[in-house]
C-alpha cells in the first residue's frame, strides 16, 4: 500500500507541479 502510493505520487506529482507553475506564470503575466 505505501509503495503503491509513493509510486503514484511520484508519477502524478510532476505534471501537477508543472500545471501549478504554469498557472502561477499566467497569473503573473495578467
Curated annotation (Swiss-Prot):
Positions where N-acetyltyrosine occurs in the chain: 1
Localization annotation: Secreted
UniProt KW Acetylation keyword: yes
UniProt keyword Secreted, yes or no: yes
GO cellular component: extracellular region
Family to which the UniProt record says this protein belongs: Belongs to the POMC family.
Protein name in the entry: Beta-endorphin-2
Keywords noted in UniProt: Acetylation, Endorphin, Secreted
Native source species: Oncorhynchus keta (Chum salmon)
Single GO BP term: neuropeptide signaling pathway
Lineage of the organism: Eukaryota, Metazoa, Chordata, Craniata, Vertebrata
Amino acid at each position: 500500500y505505501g509503495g503503491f502510493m509513493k509510486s503514484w505520487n511520484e508519477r502524478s506529482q510532476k505534471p501537477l507541479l508543472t500545471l501549478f507553475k504554469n498557472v502561477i506564470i499566467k497569473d503573473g503575466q495578467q
